[in-house]
Curated annotation (Swiss-Prot):
UniProt lineage: Bacteria, Bacillati, Mycoplasmatota, Mycoplasmoidales, Mycoplasmoidaceae
Root EC class: transferase
UniProt xrefs under InterPro entries: G3P_acylTferase_PlsY (IPR003811)
Quaternary structure annotation from Swiss-Prot or TrEMBL: Probably interacts with PlsX.
Key words, A-Z: Cell membrane, Lipid biosynthesis, Lipid metabolism, Membrane, Phospholipid biosynthesis, Phospholipid metabolism, Transferase, Transmembrane, Transmembrane helix
Pathway listed: Lipid metabolism; phospholipid metabolism
Molecular function, one GO term: acyl-phosphate glycerol-3-phosphate acyltransferase activity
Organism: Malacoplasma penetrans (strain HF-2) (Mycoplasma penetrans)
Gene: plsY
Enzyme Commission code(s) on record: 2.3.1.275
Identification of the protein by name: Glycerol-3-phosphate acyltransferase
Amino acid sequence: MNIGNLIGIIILFLFIGYFIGNILFGILISKSQGVDIRTLGSGNVGATNVTRNLGRISGAIVMVLDFFKSWFSTFVCLLIYKALRYSIGDESAYANAGVIIYLGGFAAIIGHCFPCFYFYTLFKTKFNFEEAKKYSGGKGVSSAAGFAASISPWMFFICFVLFWSICLISKYVSLASIVTVFLLPIWSLIPHLNYFYMLDVAQANINPIPPFNRPFEIAAIFNYSLNWWYILVTFLLELLTAVLVIYRHKENIVRLIKGEERKAFAKKTNTH
């Protein structure tokens, strides 16, 4: 695969993911009920604000749909990439570059947090961030979970259990979100958790089953010799995802420090 084709495919995948990420289900679900979620509670279009103002069923629907935005973006990129297999020609180049499908899922998170109207307003108002904030999206937690699920079901399972454990114990959705996404890049450094199931095993260069039949060779579980390129790229993407999602929670962090953050699923609608 020549560099020109690779750059073209990367741009295409980023565009696809960002476009899908721009579909803000929080707004669509709220408008189907005759209201605009941006005028309720915190004004955020994410599942938490929807739950607090429109109920748990609406919140759950938004959470699931936001989850599948990033997962579906990665899957669409996978289908396109496989369709390009024969035009690429070089099988080794095709296998080694397969990791770029995850750019679609990552771009969907960006599109979810900062849709095109946000940037349009930002440039139109000469970088008036307060005005552009009115058109910002969600905080990216559900989409980040979908992105993790597109990489590895094991990674998603760990994040799922960790998130709900912290949420149920602390009663803070924001704290659970921040801690879970902060640890997300770490899981990607463990090869057998970072299981690229969407790609063929031959392409992912990884054995999904750790060598439990050789208990004295624990180091074999952390064998980076074959799939280090996939692990490096997904680690960087998940690191950027963590930075983005934590940044989107900056106001929540301040309220947590001050002891002013709302408990999960409180009935009163203040700020999120």
